[in-house]
Regions:
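A short, internal acetyl-CoA/4′-phosphopantetheine-binding micro-motif in the GNAT/acyltransferase core
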Residues: 72-84
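A conserved beta-turn-beta hairpin within the catalytic core of GNAT-like acetyltransferases
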Residues: 64-74
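Conserved acyl-CoA
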Residues: 86-102
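Conserved beta-strand-loop-alpha-helix junction that forms the acyl-donor binding cleft
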Residues: 104-116
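Conserved beta-strand in the GNAT
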Residues: 51-62
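Short amphipathic alpha-helix that is part of the acyltransferase structural core
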Residues: 1-30
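C-terminal "cap" of GNAT-fold acetyltransferases
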Residues: 117, 121-137
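A short helix-loop-beta-strand connector motif used in the catalytic cores of GNAT acetyltransferases and
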Residues: 38-51
Length: 137
């Protein structure tokens, strides 16, 4: 079952976030549990976090800078040990309920990139940008 998270779920969300962080290319940057919970508390109020028995997805509504009337549901994090597609569909359903005109997902720049590219293309998505990070530390 997939449901909207509440403030009572913040510890579980932080646990899942720690698992995701340890797997991700961001793992070299320390995971801050308290800040994660504070951020996710705001997201519960102003966006959405959806939970399943095996994972989570979180995101928010975002107007495109070049056309603010064009509002999309932007995925900020998505982590599941299984049934990840069900979370994706639930996020899309949430976005549709909010009246968005599109969805934006990202994928980690890791060994799963090609697999995720295939998943997104099969789900009707097209690549619109690629992100890069430069550490100054």
């Amino acid at each position: 079952m997939i449901r909207k998270a509440t403030h009572d779920d913040l510890d579980r969300i932080a646990d899942l976030g720690a698992d995701f962080h340890a797997f991700s290319p961001w793992r070299e940057i320390p995971f801050d549990r308290d800040s994660t919970k504070a951020f996710c508390a705001r997201l519960v109020e102003g966006g959405v976090i959806l939970l399943s028995d095996h994972g989570m997805i979180g995101g928010m509504l975002n107007p495109l800078y070049f056309n603010p009337a064009h509002i999309v549901a932007v995925e900020l994090f998505w982590w599941a040990s299984k049934d990840g597609l069900a979370l994706m569909r639930a996020f899309e359903d949430w976005g549709a309920e909010q009246g968005v005109v599109g969805y934006q997902f990202s994928a980690l720049g890791d060994a799963q990139s090609e697999r995720m590219d295939t998943l997104f293309q099969r789900a009707g998505y097209r690549k619109v940008e690629t992100g890069y990070y430069k550490d100054l530390g």
